[in-house]
Amino acid sequence: MRKILYALIACVAFCAQSCQESLEDKAEREAKEYTKSFCPTPTVNYTRTDSVVFYKSTKSYTYYCSFSDAFDNEEIVNKNKQAIHEGIHKMLTDNPGLKSYKEAGFKFVYIVHSTKEPTKILYQYSFSFTK
């Protein structure tokens, strides 16, 4: 009987603790887990995700990426900036996993660096979905 009671108490304590994670804490944890598990990602369409960070102070989910090869060129990026912007916006809009973050007013920031010159920013934009 005592074992069942202790197991029940442990289960209730665990459930209560997991329910207390704020949306900001969840975003921070998920960003860290994604970065640890997947970054840097393989390069696809000349783009690699280097890391993902959630900044609680600004409620910003920030993606740090790099352009490589043909896209690692400021002139080409500038010519295609609108298409890049629209593609990222569509990806964020169509992602159901981000719904609660968008509803909470989180911003999604993309900062894309050059692979050849890592300190050079080729693209940067902050997307907001508040109504």
Language-model features: where?
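Short, non-transmembrane amphipathic alpha-helical segments
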Residues: 73-99
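C-terminal motif of bacterial Sec signal peptides marking the signal peptidase cleavage site
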Residues: 15-18
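Short, intrinsically disordered low-complexity segments
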Residues: 1-2, 88
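Polar/charged, Gly/Pro-rich intrinsically disordered segments
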Residues: 24, 28, 32-33, 37, ...
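Bacterial signal peptide processing site
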Residues: 20-22
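Sec-dependent signal peptide recognition
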Residues: 2-9
